[in-house]
Amino acid sequence: MANSKSAKKRATQAERRRQHNASRRSMMRTYMKKTIAAIEAGDKEAATAALAIATPLLDRMATKGLIHKNKAARHKARFTAAIKAL
């Protein structure tokens, strides 16, 4: 456990960031699942709408450092290709 005042503060801040990041990661996964569900259902309009919400969200998470930028690009490319194939 942290002994110094600064170490205690860092531990508190790290826990706060962990909870914040967990919330953001959960939100990101939820929107990705909505996009996947629309694609699997074969609903092109719903999939396009879900992708329109998920794309800037993935970009934002990559910018914030929550996920790697290549992971965001990979998901966007795969979702777009899957929607075009519908």
Curated annotation (Swiss-Prot):
Identify the Gene3D superfamilies for this entry.
Answer: Ribosomal protein S20
Q: Which Pfam families match?
A: Ribosomal_S20p (PF01649)
- Give the record's GO CC terms: cytosol; small ribosomal subunit
Q: What are the protein's UniProt keywords? A: Ribonucleoprotein, Ribosomal protein, RNA-binding, rRNA-binding
Where is the segment annotated Disordered?
Answer: 1-28
Coiled-coil annotated residue ranges, if any: none
InterPro entries of this UniProt entry? Ribosomal_bS20, Ribosomal_bS20_sf
Q: Which family does it belong to?
A: Belongs to the bacterial ribosomal protein bS20 family.
- Tell me the protein's name: Small ribosomal subunit protein bS20
Q: Which organism is it from?
A: Aliivibrio salmonicida (strain LFI1238) (Vibrio salmonicida (strain LFI1238))
